[in-house]
Amino acid sequence: MAGAMVSIVGRPNVGKSTLFNKIMGKRISIVEDKPGVTRDRIYGNVEWLDKKFILVDTGGLDPNAEDILFSKVRLQVEAAIDASDVILFLVDAKEGLMPEDEEIANILRRAKKEVILVCNKVDSFKEMPPTYYDFFSLGLGNPIPISASNGLGIGELLDEVVKKLPQEELEYTEETIKIAVIGKPNVGKSSLVNKILGEERVIVSNIPGTTRDAIDTPFSKDGKNYVLIDTAGIRRKSRISESIERYSVLRALAAIERSDICLLMIDATEGPTEQDTKIAGYAFENGKGIIIVVNKWDAIKKDNNTVNEYTKMVREKLSFISFAPILFISAKTGQRVHRVLETVDKVWEEYNKRITTGLLNNVLNEAMLMFPPPADKGKPLKVYYTSQVGIKPPSFVVFVNEPELMHFSYLRFIENTLRQNFGFEGVPVVISTRKRGEN
């Protein structure tokens, strides 16, 4: 399942990041970095044996991960358990069984999650180090031996991971609009969901989504079918306080993966935070429709310029999703909440929009006559034609003489031309180049 989450946990210095990077390097294709998107490489999309999941490096979640106190290791592990479907519990064969390993194992045994015990730093399978057998006492099954540094045993480990992934979640029809309500804790996600559903009063049913406790709520309005994926239901009462903010990003990932359109909720009293930027970046990189919903607008003192000034500030901080419409609402009072679904419908239309090849090339050819493709080191870039190759999000291929001659600034010009002529409000536009004659 695309939204399943697998976290690597363990005490400091057992090789969590090394294992993460080894799998990343072998099996993960990261979407190319876009200007303005904060990428902190703590997670990546993995596909193995036709199964997809999100791999999380918990070591990367805390900048001081390698010297944190044990109490923080415990918080980190508990937070990872809360957000994940499968846990890779990494131990160190060279150092052997440590008290911290036993404490983490105690936490994991109480958790109702799939746990795979992974014994790192085993350099050869011909003769296991004596310390390897000590880990059987943890009661978490046979340790899978690996060497994260040289890749030994990684394939066998991934085989085991896909066996333990949860079953596919409920499938909805292509016409059902899947909406993820995302944002950091206490921004008002549940209040917005309740207000939307309270207005419509046509809830079909509450369906427990995945093992992450997200709640899928299907409902209908004016003949259209929607599903609200509410990540707020994931945040349980917990002793975790310091880690909760960090892990809220992880909780949003699975919901984003399953959605078509994301409602990125921002607290009007705080403005966009670094956390909001991370969540928005993930939605953008995964090609989702995005609507920025500024909540708690009733708590802001206003004058004639407040909306314009606030809009400018949001655009500056979230410049990479400048295509996203901004709504100012109060989930508490219901102010302008009716506009949320109206905007979702508009973005959904843009998300599914197709442009005929003839019209597309007429518009682009006219624009390119005014602003011809640049030459690189004297060699001119020739653009032959452009085709739309997909929707959700709208995707285009530009056929050229030499793809390496295409500068990102000219791709940006093509994107801007498409937006000016065809709209695409609220959705990313994916443009790639291909040499003419290539399939």
Swiss-Prot record:
Transmembrane segments: none annotated. GTP 1 binds at residues 10-17, 57-61, 120-123. Gene3D superfamilies: 3.30.300.20, P-loop containing nucleotide triphosphate hydrolases (3.40.50.300). Residues 4-169, 177-352 form the EngA-type G domain. The keyword Cytoplasm does not apply. One of its GO terms (biological process) is ribosome biogenesis. GO terms for molecular function: GTP binding; ribosome binding. Pfam families: KH_dom-like (PF14714), MMR_HSR1 (PF01926). Keywords: GTP-binding, Nucleotide-binding, Repeat, Ribosome biogenesis. Signal peptide: none annotated. GTP 2 binds at residues 183-190, 230-234, 295-298. Residues 353-437 form the KH-like domain. Associates with the 50S ribosomal subunit. PANTHER family: GTPASE DER. GTPase that plays an essential role in the late steps of ribosome biogenesis. Belongs to the TRAFAC class TrmE-Era-EngA-EngB-Septin-like GTPase superfamily. EngA (Der) GTPase family. This is GTPase Der. It comes from Thermoanaerobacter pseudethanolicus (strain ATCC 33223 / 39E) (Clostridium thermohydrosulfuricum). The gene is der.
